[in-house]
């Protein structure tokens, strides 16, 4: 990859064993029932899964990557604040601490409706919130995400994919959205612009070229501490 970017190794999408049960291992509605009625059994299963998570973390820490990826998809309805605080936050914090001790940065996938999780995110210790998806696809503006993440966390994303789609967002509205986005970037520090969650096939590719024009006009950003 060289100077073109970073190769980032992936850990699990479920940030903790309990999160993996919700995210991958069972139907969501079943998980909610079991979490209320059979929570101790789920916690025992999480303990049995812990060695696998430890092995994944050890493998990531042993590699030469500068940034590692761990955990994804937090939503204040499906990973509601008390659940996030008890079942996800400690695990992310542990991964963040291990990453920092190893001289690495931690990136996690923070798309989703997370307004009521913003005050918990800084306690997780991650360095980059990736795929940040602001309004109109969620209720938070990019400014609110940046304020919630805090001054030491980098926001990766910020351009909701729907503004690139002609059938959803008229050209004039797209231009107004991008003008407002760039007007609120301040110095641009700790922002990596990207399309969230991804670039769907129906986007107007000319609009992606236009985004580059906004970036060029904004000018270079000096990294904090540089």
Where in the sequence are the language-model features?
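Active-site loop segments of alpha/beta catalytic cores
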Residues: 1-226
């Amino acid at each position: 990859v060289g100077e073109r970017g970073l190769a980032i190794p992936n850990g699990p999408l479920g940030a903790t064993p309990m999160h993996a049960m919700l995210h991958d291992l069972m139907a969501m509605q079943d998980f909610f029932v079991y979490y209320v009625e059979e929570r101790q059994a789920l916690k025992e299963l999480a303990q049995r899964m812990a060695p696998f998570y430890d092995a994944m973390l050890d493998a990531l820490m042993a590699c030469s990557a500068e940034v590692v990826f761990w955990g994804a998809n937090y939503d204040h309805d499906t990973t509601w604040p008390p659940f996030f605080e008890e079942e996800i936050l400690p695990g992310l914090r542990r991964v963040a601490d291990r990453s920092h001790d190893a001289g690495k940065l931690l990136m996690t996938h923070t798309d989703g409706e997370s307004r009521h999780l913003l005050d918990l995110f800084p306690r997780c210790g991650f360095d980059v919130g990736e795929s940040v998806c602001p309004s109109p696809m969620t209720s938070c503006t990019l400014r609110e995400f940046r304020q919630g993440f805090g001054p030491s966390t980098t926001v990766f994303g910020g351009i909701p994919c729907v503004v690139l789609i002609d059938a959803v967002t008229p050209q004039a509205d797209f231009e107004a959205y991008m003008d407002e986005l760039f007007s609120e970037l301040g110095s641009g520090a700790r922002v990596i612009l990207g399309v969230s969650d991804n670039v769907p096939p129906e986007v107007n590719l000319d609009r992606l070229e236009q985004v580059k024009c906004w970036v060029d006009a904004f000018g270079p950003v000096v990294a904090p501490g540089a």
